[in-house]
Design a protein with these regions (language model features):
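Pro/Thr/Ser/Gly-rich low-complexity, intrinsically disordered linker/stalk tracts
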Residues: 1-28, 84-89
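Recognizes extended acidic, P/S/T-rich segments that occur
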Residues: 32-69, 77-85
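A generic structural motif
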Residues: 26, 75-77
Length: 89
């Protein structure tokens, strides 16, 4: 089970100013995850899509736009998505 999603250590991540946010989550015993981030809440066009064995990842893609809400989600290899969002400044 994946829970407690955070961006830069914050659960309610409004006002993220960094261009390389750190996404983290509590992951129980799972050790393989897929992470997606999008500017669309339906994830129709992913800004980030990666697989990791860690309970965190660092965004290193194109610069994020100021004043925009981004949506992100994570799941274990066979699990359901757990979703969150954050806003940049």
């Amino acid at each position: 089970m994946i829970f407690d999603l955070k961006v830069n250590g914050q659960r309610k991540a409004d006002g993220i100013s960094t261009v390389s946010p750190v996404f983290s989550w509590e992951c129980g015993t799972e050790r393989q995850f897929t992470v997606q981030m999008s500017s669309n809440p339906k994830f129709q066009s992913a800004v980030m899509y990666l697989d990791t064995r860690n309970c965190y990842c660092i965004y290193d893609g194109v610069p994020l736009q100021a004043g925009k809400t981004y949506y992100w989600r994570v799941r274990s290899r066979v699990g359901e998505w757990t979703e969150s969002q954050f806003t940049t400044i």
